[in-house]
Design a protein with these regions (language model features):
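N-terminal glycine-rich anion-binding loop in soluble enzyme alpha/beta folds
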Residues: 1-60
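Conserved, mostly hydrophobic/aromatic
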Residues: 18, 68, 103
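Acidic (Asp/Glu)-rich catalytic clusters
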Residues: 58-64, 95
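Glycine-rich, proline-tolerant flexible connector loops at the mouths of alpha/beta enzymes
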Residues: 70-82
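Alpha-helix-loop-beta-strand connector modules within alpha/beta enzyme cores
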Residues: 83-101
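Conserved small/polar residues in nucleotide/adenosyl-binding loops
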Residues: 126-128
Length: 128
């Protein structure tokens, strides 16, 4: 796989990996509003907003970059709908010819740890 990544970096002339760590606070309001109008202001709507934002990023950057790195915790916080958004994001990235580096480690930085905690039913504390 590393050989493929190196070739893709040479092809794009971009030693860059775009992180796909969707946080609702950073998704444009128009994207969130459209997703909430279709799916509701719930986990499904939040996951749909993330997916739409990811799709836009992927389509705009696919010919410029070699790889993307979706952070699983940012999807898990939206439950099953979030995992579906993660799967669709990965599938689209692959269809667009991008290398996908899954960021699925546990024990991470503050925002990621908070997303893991939220993904576990909003519990006050979790042990990781």
């Amino acid at each position: 796989m590393i050989t493929t990544l190196i070739e893709k970096i040479k092809e794009t002339k971009a030693p860059i990996c775009v992180g796909l760590d969707p946080m609702l606070a950073y998704i444009p309001d128009e994207v969130k509003q459209a997703a909430f109008a279709e799916k509701g202001e719930n986990l499904e709507g939040a996951a749909e907003a993330c997916l739409r934002f990811n799709e836009a990023i992927l389509r705009e950057t696919a010919d410029l970059i070699p790889a993307v790195k979706p952070q699983i915790a940012m999807y898990e916080q939206f439950g099953i709908p979030g995992l579906i958004a993660y799967e669709k994001t990965v599938r689209l990235a692959k269809e667009l010819g991008l290398i996908v580096i899954a960021d699925v480690k546990r024990g991470d930085i503050g925002s990621t740890s908070a997303a893991y905690a939220e993904g576990h039913l909003g519990l006050s504390l979790i042990h990781i």
